[in-house]
């Protein structure tokens, strides 16, 4: 069975796992903690495709009509059980 890699779809922005050093620089630059970052669930298809685990920080780079490119950061967390 062939699996679809969602990261190859033209509508899905680039997702990359950040190194610990890059995360430290990000948090220092913006004077925040990881708790201040927006969250993304560990079972999100793009998170699964890039191999991220809970606790990783993902850098997402989107094309933007106004800015050319927009970068956002998300902390990978486990989805709460219902």
UniProtKB/Swiss-Prot annotation:
Family, as annotated: Belongs to the archaeal Rpo5/eukaryotic RPB5 RNA polymerase subunit family.
Organism taxonomic ancestry: Archaea, Methanobacteriati, Methanobacteriota, Stenosarchaea group, Methanomicrobia
Subcellular location: Cytoplasm
Predominant cellular place of this UniProt entry's protein: cytoplasm
Gene field: rpo5
Keyword Cytoplasm: yes
Gene Ontology CC terms: cytoplasm; DNA-directed RNA polymerase complex
Enzyme class: transferase
UniProt source species: Methanocorpusculum labreanum (strain ATCC 43576 / DSM 4855 / Z)
Function according to Swiss-Prot or TrEMBL: DNA-dependent RNA polymerase (RNAP) catalyzes the transcription of DNA into RNA using the four ribonucleoside triphosphates as substrates.
Protein name: DNA-directed RNA polymerase subunit Rpo5
EC numbers for this chain: 2.7.7.6
GO biological processes: transcription by RNA polymerase II; transcription elongation by RNA polymerase I; tRNA transcription by RNA polymerase III
Catalysed reactions listed for this entry: RNA(n) + a ribonucleoside 5'-triphosphate = RNA(n+1) + diphosphate
Keywords, comma-separated and alphabetical: Cytoplasm, DNA-directed RNA polymerase, Nucleotidyltransferase, Transcription, Transferase
Gene3D superfamilies: RPB5-like RNA polymerase subunit
Subunit structure, interactors included: Part of the RNA polymerase complex.
Gene Ontology MF annotations: DNA binding; DNA-directed RNA polymerase activity
Cross-referenced Pfam families: RNA_pol_Rpb5_C
